C-alpha cells in the first residue's frame, strides 16, 4: 500500500520505448522515510501517518522536536509530512516507507516548489506582448495602462504586474512511474516535475486516475 513518500529531484533524462521513441523522464531519489507518528480517531480525531526524510545537524533541532523524533528511533530528520489514511493498521512507529511501496505503471501526483526566478517583468512573468521597437516609440517593455484615473482611481486587486516570479508550491498531477530501482531508492517518472535538481518533492498516489472524458461527454 502506497501512502506517500518524500524525495529529492536528481534531474532529467530519457528512456526509449518499444517503438524507439524517446520518452523524457525525471529521476527522483525517494526515501527511505521513517514513520515518526501514527494518528488515529481515538486520540487525534482522524487517522494519519507522519513521515520524516533527510538528515540535518543536531544544533538545528529544538528539544520538543528532538523528543518527538526520538520516539521513532531517529532524531535528526529534516523534513516532516503527514498523510491522511483510512486507518493505520499494518503500520508501526519507527517503520520505513520505501519506493518498494509503489509499483511501475502507477499514477502519482508530485508536489514541490517551482524554480525561483526573482523579480521579473511582465513579458517574462505573464507572457505579455512587447510594444513597438521603432518609429519613435519608447514603450518597449512597459506595462501600458494599469487603470483609469478618477474612476475607479485605484488599481484593482489581482492586476498582473511585475513582481517575484516562481518559488511557489505547485503540483503536477497524473504522472506515471515507469521504473523503480529499490537498491538505489530511485523512482523514474515520466515527464517533468517542479523544482530544480536537489529540490524536495512530495510524491503521493494520484487523486484523479483514469482518462479524461471526451468533450461534451459525461
UniProtKB/Swiss-Prot annotation:
GO cellular component: cytosolic large ribosomal subunit
Region (Disordered): 126-169
Keyword vocabulary terms for this entry: Ribonucleoprotein, Ribosomal protein, RNA-binding, rRNA-binding
Pfam families the UniProt entry points to: Ribosomal_L3
Superkingdom of origin: Bacteria
Gene Ontology biological-process annotations: translation
MF GO annotations: rRNA binding; structural constituent of ribosome
Signal peptide boundaries: none
InterPro entries: Ribosomal_uL3 (IPR000597), Ribosomal_uL3_bac/org-type (IPR019927), Ribosomal_uL3_CS (IPR019926), Transl_B-barrel_sf (IPR009000)
Membrane-traversing stretches: none
Record bears the keyword rRNA-binding: yes
UniProt KW RNA-binding keyword: yes
Disulphide bond pairs: none
Annotated family: Belongs to the universal ribosomal protein uL3 family.
Subunit structure: Part of the 50S ribosomal subunit. Forms a cluster with proteins L14 and L19.
Function: One of the primary rRNA binding proteins, it binds directly near the 3'-end of the 23S rRNA, where it nucleates assembly of the 50S subunit.
The name this protein goes by in its record: Large ribosomal subunit protein uL3
Species of origin: Synechococcus sp. (strain CC9902)
Gene giving rise to this polypeptide: rplC
